[in-house]
Amino acid sequence: MYGIYGLFFAAVALYSVALVIYRLYLHPLSRFPGPKIAAATGWYEFYHEVIRGGMYIHEIQRMHREYGPIIRINPYEIVINDPDYYTTVYVASNTRRSEKWYTLQGTGLEGKALSFFSHFRTCRTRMHMTDQIVGAMGMTMGHELHRRRRKHFDPFFSRLGVTQIEGVILDEIQLLTDRLEGNRKSGRTIQMEHVMAAFTGDIVTKICSEKSPDMIRHPDFGKEWYVTIHTYQLQVHLFVQFPYLISLTQLIPRGLVMHFSPGAAAFKSLHQYAFDHITEAKKDMGRAVKVQQEAGRSSVFRHVLSSDMPGTERETERLAREALQLFGAGTATLVRAFSMIFYHVLSDPQMRGQLREELKDIMAGYPAKRPTWQELERLPYLHGIVKEGLRLSYGVMRHLARVSPDQPLQFREWTIPAGTPVGMSSHSLHSDPETFPEPARFLPERWMKDRHHPNMNRNWVPFARGSRMCIGMNLALAEMYWVLAVLFRPGAPQLELFETTEADVVPVRDYVGGIPEFGTKGVRVRVV
């Protein structure tokens, strides 16, 4: 018996040594710069992401300082830090095929060697691709499938589509304003992350399914929604490293999952909420005689359910994944951008005064007379505040890897083999001191025409670029311009910071979206 165990462990040890040798000396990426330990095993990334808690992005920055602009960050992935190369990695759909990459890092077994373990990795990859989120458009790996899925959502999230639902946004903002006014001089402390989670969550659910949880009316605003999304966000690295855990959570009763893993329970709760939304939308479709097709008059999922998509694409489970991603993405990163802006505007009387002065004329007739989103965009100081809020909150903080499946990429003297995941991060581009002097400072003035650096727009990528850029960009921008215009206009509810510092908003940990240091309390205000 012991002999069998001994042979097994000897075989595993021999395989591990052979795999490390292959990765370091025979792998197609073996000549690329980077630390040997990162090239040898995914456990190095696991340590920085899971054990240290979303800190690999800072280790990657250190690698760039030591090894240069192109580095190998794990056995199979390249990261580049060169703003001029961004549009080569993130290309339009008519330039070349571009596929998304989701790693199964951390086990140390995901090699490309021809072996049983290589087959095991392939099986796990296939399982991952059919897992809870990968069925969603934004997580679709294949180029053509992503294009086919996205075209059904584009009309709702295009600039035209968003302008057609300005009324929905403005009605929600009026509710938000009324709720804040209702707390005037009450002495109550309000956490703005909960407020904005309610606001953004209500809007995206209403657009997607015509119904919303109406969180803006809840006594605690969107606290439960925010905590659920944030708790799941804190588990994202574990799920990326071990994607089969997501499938397992669906097989375990929610109460038991909650006891052992609040993060997994949060995912299960979000998934169930999305699943129920799609189920209800299908019931409504069955009762409907005619479905309106116009983006401004129908919900996203009514439109999709009545489209010419194949039946498999309209299955409840797959659309629930779409809903899950739209609901989560429509809240998490945008809340961080709002937090960044609220803190800096409320903590700087001069900035607040300048913004109010700029809004005085255009918002004079509000709410009877409402300017358009396009008119608000033309206000230079408001424009600068929105730009800085998104720059310093990063959008998606981590590198977003893309794969060129058909042709190699050339970066300077380096030829990157076709099929290699290549990523770049908004964190690097937004923190570039050559483009953004004093990059850590919140300076709306830097976006003014007389101070505008020619490369600032090149480096500003909170929504990414190319065929897979964030589909919700226009909705997010419209929400930001309108919320800031209404809440900082003359006569708006007067918000005052309560025990909030810059550390409460500065992203230091990468959980796809950046989050502040653990233990910070967010932006807390009182209405005076």
UniProtKB/Swiss-Prot annotation:
Please report the record's description of how this protein sits within the membrane. Answer: Single-pass membrane protein
User: Any idea which positions bind heme?
Assistant: 470
Q: Which cofactor does it need?
A: heme
Q: What is its main location?
A: membrane
CDD domains, per database record:
CYP58-like
Q: Which parts pass through the membrane?
A: 5-27
Record GO cellular component, one term: membrane
Q: What is its EC number?
A: 1.-.-.-
Write down the InterPro entries for this protein, in alphabetical order.
Cyt_P450, Cyt_P450_E_grp-I, Cyt_P450_sf, Cytochrome_P450_monoxygenase
Tell me, what is one Gene Ontology molecular-function annotation carried by this entry?
iron ion binding
**Subcellular localization, as worded in the UniProt entry:** Membrane
Write down the superkingdom of origin: Eukaryota
How might one describe the protein's use in biotech or industry?
Answer: Variecolin and its derivatives produced by employing P450 monooxygenases from other fungal terpenoid pathways exhibit anticancer activity, thus, the skeleton of variecolin could be considered a privileged scaffold for developing anticancer agents.
- Reaction(s) catalyzed by this protein? variecoladiene + 4 reduced [NADPH--hemoprotein reductase] + 4 O2 = variecolin + 4 oxidized [NADPH--hemoprotein reductase] + 6 H2O + 4 H(+)
Q: Function, please?
A: Cytochrome P450 monooxygenase; part of the gene cluster that mediates the biosynthesis of the sesterterpene variecolin. The first step in the pathway is performed by the variecoladiene synthase vrcA that possesses both prenyl transferase and terpene cyclase activity, converting isopentenyl diphosphate and dimethylallyl diphosphate into geranylfarnesyl pyrophosphate (GFPP) and then converting GFPP into the tetracyclic variecoladiene.
What's the protein called, per UniProt?
A: Cytochrome P450 monooxygenase vrcB
- To which species is this protein native? Aspergillus aculeatus (strain ATCC 16872 / CBS 172.66 / WB 5094)
Query: What gene is this protein translated from?
Result: vrcB
